[in-house]
Amino acid sequence: IPDAQLERLYNTNLFFCLFYSAGITLDTEELVLVTSRSPRYYVSAAYWDRDSLLWSFPTVVDADPALARRMLDYVFGRQRRNLGVHSRYIDGTVLEPGFELDELMAPVLALERYVGATGDRDCLEDNAIRSGLTDILRTLRTNRHRSIALYETFLQPTDDVRSYPYLTYDNVLVWKALR
């Protein structure tokens, strides 16, 4: 990066993404993703697809593709049964209910980014990933408008209940994931 200030900012973000967005559990030594490992964050050690996959994952893919692959295994494994639910514990159970379209699309967008960055198309044959994508498409169909290609959400990306069911930001994520 030619700009020293920008490089410093990138490296700070990289450090956070590598060391604060994931950890190893003490009991099972399993990789888990979290909103943040920092005790200063108001929801530390919970799991949100958006935070892990739309915010941290792009940097992790650039810096450590092997870790990025393990992150996808966790998402499409441990977290798969509640994809699209607002927030979850690290074992995949629901912490705070409520459907969020951006949370549902985050695994698809992360997978697309991973394959594009690494060229690893073998991951697309993984049974857990294939099942997860099938689950996501099924959930997406149940939230589609009956006559136009818009998809409904219950919670906004701000985690507040939405005033209108069809949000532009969320539907752009659907468009990007399905193109």
Stretch-by-stretch model annotation:
Residues Y20-D27, T142-F154:
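C-terminal ends of transmembrane alpha-helices
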Residues Y42-R146, N171:
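Aromatic-rich carbohydrate-recognition surfaces in CAZymes
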Residues N171-R179:
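Active-site neighborhood of glycoside hydrolase catalytic domains
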Residues V32-Y41, L83-F99, L150-Y166:
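Acidic/His metal-coordination segments adjacent to aromatic residues that form catalytic metal sites
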Residues C17, L111, L137, L178-R179:
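A structural signal for well-ordered alpha-helices, especially hydrophobic packing surfaces
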Residues I1-A45:
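Acidic/polar, glycine-enriched structural segments that form the non-catalytic walls/loops
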